[in-house]
Amino acid sequence: FYVRLVSQYLYAAQYDNATVQAIMNEALKYQGWEYVYGGASPTTSFDCSGLTQWCYGVAGITLPRTAQAQYDATQHIPFGDAQPGDLVFFQGTYNCGDYITHVGIYVGDKRMYHAGNPIGFADLTSAYWQAHLICAGRVGH
């Protein structure tokens, strides 16, 4: 059990889709970095939408800057239909006036990679994320 628990954080993620692989190769460079509100590049570190905008941009996909704008720019799909590389959107994670307050990258197995504090993986089956989850969003490639 312990080996499985630790190994989930040590493996080099492999994805079937080359675009998703490029997104995650970039994203994993920042694992463990501090969350910085308004951060949108490696020189500043990242907030949630800054991380997604940067990593998708490196893979050649343009995303808007904020979580709300990214939500508005994606095709909304039920979370159960999410595939690695889709975005996952949340509401009410803090009071900012927007409907959508957080975004992460769906990586499969009901997990996301996001700019939490620190940047890294999160289990989407946890009570916290389930309480705030709105949907997944498919980015047009």
Q: Model-derived features: where do they sit?
A:
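Intrinsically disordered, low-complexity
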Residues: F1-E34, Q130-H141
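Catalytic cysteine-centered active-site loop
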Residues: W33-P84
